[in-house]
Amino acid sequence: MKQHAGIRRAVCAGLAVIWLLLVPLWTAGAETSGAPDYAQAENWAYFSDGEDRAADVFFICPTVYGGADQAFNMPMEDQKARASFLGATNMEKGIYDESCRFYAPYYRQAGLSVYDLPEEEREPWLALAYEDVKAAFMYYLENRNDGRPLVLAGFSQGADMCLRLMKDCFDDEATSGLLVACYAIGWRITEEDLRQYPHLRMASGEDDTGVIISFNSEAESVQDSLLIPAGTRSLAINPLNWRTDATPASRQENPGACFPDYSGEIVTEIPHLTGAYIDPVRGSLKVPDVSPADYPPGLSLFSEGVYHLYDYQFFYRSLQENVAVRLNAYLRAHAAR
């Protein structure tokens, strides 16, 4: 028990350092910069990293910019913000880069302060962020893809941006035929979204392709959050047993929770940390075997028991394995054509 308590303290201390990096960004006053030119290498956190891989991943970073009175979107020239952006990308890069050549654009993401606004008032700043993401994606598609299999991936605001790309750019066969899968983790997608965009398909197992993988982790007691407001049902798949119903996965099915630092190095790995099951009412991913006190929300946007910060970390090895499984399924299917 003492050993586990020490691990938890180390993990939480590391995460506290990460979130403290946001503090100076929150108060820095700067006007939002102009649109980036994605033909310039400086506007990419990663551009074609891992040339020997069989596929590409286009990864969209989560929110790291706090926001300021004069700048609700991250200024591209803000070097502290770029350093945090790169660090947050590194924390999730290892899930994908064993299988994929890695692309990750810097973009004028909406600051955390935007999420304090009512939902209908957030859109101008999120729309600006999406302008950059789409421009970067189109540059990649037109200049670098060359028919290669594609994994689309993001977390939190990055997942929101992934879903916007899926709605906007994957309704034609040429683009959708490239898609191995879209890992849009840490944001909601609903039945209404699927009705409005019938070309979208949710994953139904561990190896289907051209699909969306999504979930939002929380304690069993949570009934409302920024990510899944009360009365909303999100669509999800369990990242341990790859079921979409409420069938629980035990902690023994979890090959490893991993907690990387800003370099991407895994500081702590805990096999069998927790199981998970999908709440049939909320569509959230309930995480029963950890304590909210040991894994605090980290941001005032989230109440106790919202495990948003840990969506990738709790299920790191399972997600890493699944990227390879889906890519192999895609390659087999396309080799047979």
Language-model regions, residue ranges each:
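Bacterial N-terminal signal peptides that target proteins for export
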Residues: 3-15
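Structural recognition of the beta-strand scaffold that forms the well-ordered cores
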Residues: 56-60, 102-106, 151-152, 181-184, ...
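Sec-dependent signal peptide cleavage junction
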Residues: 24-30
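Surface cap/lid and interfacial helix-loop subdomains adjacent to catalytic sites
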Residues: 129-146, 168-329, 333-337
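Alpha/beta-hydrolase fold nucleophile elbow
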Residues: 145-154
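Short, surface-exposed "cap/lid" segments of acyl-processing enzymes
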Residues: 36-104
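Bacterial N-terminal signal peptides
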Residues: 13-24
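Gly/Ala-rich beta-loop-alpha elbow adjacent to hydrolase catalytic centers
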Residues: 154-158, 162
